[in-house]
């Protein structure tokens, strides 16, 4: 009987020790949620050369959920609002958005390009999607803050 109690006690100590010392891998940041555009950066030779603030009244929001994206923009200098809907995926370095439909102007643009690939810099409450030219040089970024 003493041996059985000793074995059970040893097993409990072992399991408890393993549970305490086992480390879980850090979780990846997630795109899921609602994000609002804060401003833009312009790049030259991979370096930020200019920060562009949003004009008064300009708002752009992106919502990512379950592999889908929806975005909307309003600009007081443009009487036509903009929106788009599609799917997205992220890799270690990229955000790939495939737009399925949107407003009239977006649908016109979709005749030539439906998939948009950006360099992704993702943190807990901010992200930047960085566009690049055909040579792989950064050109500009949209910078977002999580609102939900």
PLM features: residue spans?
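Positively charged n-region of N-terminal signal peptides that target proteins for export
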Residues: 1-4
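Lipid interaction determinants
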Residues: 6, 15-83, 96-148
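Repetitive helical segments and hydrophobic/amphipathic motifs
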Residues: 11-12
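Phosphoinositide-binding peripheral membrane targeting modules
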Residues: 86
């Amino acid at each position: 009987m003493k041996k059985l109690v000793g074995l059970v006690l040893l097993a409990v100590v072992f399991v408890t020790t393993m549970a305490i010392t086992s480390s879980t891998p850090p979780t990846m940041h997630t795109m899921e949620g609602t994000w609002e555009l804060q401003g833009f950066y312009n790049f030259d030779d991979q370096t930020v050369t200019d920060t562009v603030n949003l004009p008064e009244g300009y708002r752009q929001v992106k919502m990512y959920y379950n592999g889908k994206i929806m975005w909307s923009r309003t600009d007081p200098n443009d009487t036509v609002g903009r929106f788009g809907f599609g799917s997205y995926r992220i890799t270690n370095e990229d955000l790939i958005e495939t737009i399925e439909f949107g407003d009239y102007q977006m649908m016109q643009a979709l005749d030539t390009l439906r998939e948009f690939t950006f360099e992704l810099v993702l943190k807990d409450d901010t992200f930047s999607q960085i566009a690049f030219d055909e040579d792989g040089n950064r050109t500009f970024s949209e910078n977002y803050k999580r609102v939900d």
